[in-house]
């Protein structure tokens, strides 16, 4: 069985990890980095770029470069958070036929799970390149405060990417797994995971206990805000720059899509620099132009200014911490460790606020970018049966219930209930002779159903005519380990029942997902073709260059007919390379043709080289001979005549 990989599908960056024995390996992508920007660019020639290559070209292609799409996943177009993003994003956010928020690139409508699938596919390929074998199964993380629709949409993204999602796991829980299994501290510990990522914020209170040699991770409570993260911090800087530039130059940059993309890049860079410096300079020449000529942007921002700009955003993270502590039934002083997850927690102001609330310094020995992917990989190892010493008890983040008489939200499963769980309750009809009931399923904490998120609805029909209050309809809520809800309703008198897996009254249908899988496979085949074509073009370019060089040096050694043939084949290949519509077969044929006719040129080159080598060897031999002769002469010259006298014998 292949390995189950762990993927942290982030708003800003994504990361993939695997377990090798009991050692974790965070895998570098093809660019050599351990995290990949969650950015997808759709190019004019249908090529799809993912990660750093997409980020690099974003300034010149802002309308077709999609980022922070996770903020839209599983959301309705009408939601106020989506409406807020419409005014901020350089790409188009549109309303799909089913009322969901989708995006648009090159005039094509794309569902957020379809876009996120491109990032997941890159993570899958990264793992496959490292392992040298196909990968088909994954554990994917989501913010703990994601609702049912968002979890389902994330699972859909995995399917589109060609992955069987074995488990959806909450990001803070994954980080706790990574922390708990890496540390030597023994005994029961209560930890708080403060997870402020690119687009979402979560806080979870988790108890780590040693139960008969098995490490048990029990989530006591979770809370958060799925529309608060580093992207919002960046936006505050962008708004500030726009305001200052307008004051100085009288030009409003907020209407200039190209300028906005450059501002986004500069804001992110400035924010990162201000985590380690007290001041940074934003310098963007030629940011725009008007009748008086080009305009340049030059602005200094101090850490104090940034902290003032985002103070309320940092403050917004504290209330969920208070609620989580209260829901867990613990006191702040009971928390043994505070773990920071997500790149935005590197900001000193955030760390200061966390310390102020929890009364202790957060741990610094957890990598905020990689901990979540590591935890997902550990959970993958548990699910594959290779690890038996870990038990994970997660919770549902929001209450679930149905709408009853008067529009009231009747809770079936309360928030922070350990999952998987099942709950059944009997309801009845509101009118005499009512033959059908509509079950409307909601998620949220408001007393009235209308104030909560409608997850889905279905009918139970064929109820025998009876006075109101007589029929007994049993409604069952069943949450699986992924936090995804299955609902059933059964008429106890007739035994008739109806069941649904909540996919929201929006979401993608199975047919749409299957089509997206086919499109993705077709794209993969198309990408392979484009890669092969690029390889052929590169080979052609190299041959043109080497042939021209050889002709310059050895062309005069060829007879006129041979030279003409080579020049004709050379021109034919050059023309094919200039023709953007030329396919691989055409270029390969021209390369082959030039290769054939250039053989004579090659022979001349080798003959010339051999002659040169032979000449060099001969010259070297002659020189050596001369050296020997000279040496002998020198030796003779150096002989000293001895004096001797003849001795005569008697």
Curated annotation (Swiss-Prot):
Residues 611-636 have a biased composition (Low complexity). The modification Phosphothreonine is found at residue 200. Keywords: ATP-binding, Chaperone, Nucleotide-binding, Phosphoprotein, Stress response. It comes from the Bacteria. GO terms for molecular function: ATP binding; ATP-dependent protein folding chaperone; unfolded protein binding. The keyword Phosphoprotein applies. Residues 611-637 are annotated as: Disordered. It holds the Pfam family HSP70. CDD domains: ASKHA_NBD_HSP70_DnaK-like. The keyword Phosphoprotein applies. InterPro entries: ATPase_NBD, Chaperone_DnaK, Heat_shock_70_CS, HSP70_C_sf, HSP70_peptide-bd_sf, Hsp_70_fam. Induction: By stress conditions e.g. heat shock. Belongs to the heat shock protein 70 family. Acts as a chaperone. This is Chaperone protein DnaK. It comes from Burkholderia ambifaria (strain MC40-6). The gene is dnaK.
């Amino acid at each position: 069985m292949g390995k189950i990989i762990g993927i942290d599908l982030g708003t800003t960056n994504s990361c993939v990890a695997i377990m090798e024995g009991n050692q974790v390996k965070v895998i570098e992508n093809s660019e050599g980095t351990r995290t990949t920007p969650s950015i997808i660019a759709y190019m004019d020639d249908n090529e799809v770029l993912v990660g750093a290559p997409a980020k690099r070209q974003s300034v010149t292609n802002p309308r077709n470069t999609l980022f922070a799409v996770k903020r839209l996943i599983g959301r309705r177009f009408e939601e106020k958070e989506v409406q807020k993003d419409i005014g901020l994003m350089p790409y188009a956010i549109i309303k799909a036929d089913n009322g969901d928020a989708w995006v648009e690139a090159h005039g094509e409508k794309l569902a957020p799970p379809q876009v996120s699938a491109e990032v997941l596919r890159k993570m899958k390929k990264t793992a496959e390149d490292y392992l040298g074998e196909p990968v088909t199964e994954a554990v994917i993380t989501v913010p703990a405060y994601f609702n049912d629709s968002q979890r389902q949409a994330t699972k859909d993204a995995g399917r589109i990417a060609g992955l069987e999602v074995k488990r959806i796991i909450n990001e803070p829980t994954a980080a706790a797994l990574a922390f708990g299994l890496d540390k030597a501290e023994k005994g029961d510990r209560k930890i708080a995971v403060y997870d402020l990522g690119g687009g979402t914020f979560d806080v979870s209170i988790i108890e780590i206990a040693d139960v008969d040699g098995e490490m048990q991770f029990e989530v006591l409570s979770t809370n958060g805000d799925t529309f608060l993260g580093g992207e919002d911090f960046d936006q505050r800087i962008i708004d500030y720059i726009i305001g200052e530039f307008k004051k100085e130059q009288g030009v409003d940059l907020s209407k200039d899509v190209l300028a906005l993309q450059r501002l986004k890049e500069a804001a992110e860079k400035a924010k990162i620099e201000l985590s380690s410096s007290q001041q940074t300079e934003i310098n963007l020449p030629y940011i725009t132009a008007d009748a008086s000529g080009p305009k340049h942007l030059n602005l200094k921002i101090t850490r104090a200014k940034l902290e003032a700009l985002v103070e309320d955003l940092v403050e917004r993270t504290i209330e969920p911490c208070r609620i989580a502590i209260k829901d867990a039934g613990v006191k702040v002083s009971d928390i043994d460790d505070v773990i920071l997850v997500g790149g935005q927690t590197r900001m000193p102001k955030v760390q200061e606020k966390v310390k102020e609330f929890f009364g202790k310094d957060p741990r610094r020995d957890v990598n905020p970018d990689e901990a979540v992917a590591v935890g997902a990989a550990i959970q993958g190892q548990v699910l594959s049966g290779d690890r038996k010493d870990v038990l994970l008890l997660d919770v549902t983040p929001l209450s679930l219930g149905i709408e009853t008489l008067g529009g009231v939200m009747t809770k079936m499963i309360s928030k922070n209930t350990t999952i998987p769980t099942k709950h059944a309750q009997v309801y009845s009809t509101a009118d005499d002779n009512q033959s059908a009931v509509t079950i409307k399923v909601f998620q949220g904490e408001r007393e009235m159903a209308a104030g909560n998120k409608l997850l889905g609805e279905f009918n139970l029909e064929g109820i025998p005519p009876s006075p109101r209050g007589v029929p007994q309809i049993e409604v069952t809520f069943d949450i699986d380990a992924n936090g995804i809800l299955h609902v059933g309703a059964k008429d106890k008198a007739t035994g008739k029942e109806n069941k649904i897996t909540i996919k929201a009254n929006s979401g993608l249908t199975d047919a749409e997902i299957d089509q997206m899988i086919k499109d993705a496979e077709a794209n993969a085949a198309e990408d392979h073709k484009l890669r092969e074509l690029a390889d052929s073009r590169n080979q052609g370019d190299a041959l043109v260059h080497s042939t021209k060089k050889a002709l310059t040096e050895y062309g005069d050694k060829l007879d006129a007919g041979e030279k003409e043939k080579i020049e004709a084949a050379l021109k034919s290949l050059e023309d094919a390379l200039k023709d953007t519509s030329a396919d691989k077969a055409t270029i390969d044929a021209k390369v082959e043709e030039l290769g054939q006719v250039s053989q004579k040129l090659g022979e001349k080159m080798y003959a010339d080289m051999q002659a040169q080598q032979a000449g060099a060897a001969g010259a070297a031999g002659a020189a050596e001979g001369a050296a020997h002769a000279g040496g002998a002469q020198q030796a003779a010259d150096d002989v000293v005549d001895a004096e001797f006298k003849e001795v005569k014998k008697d």
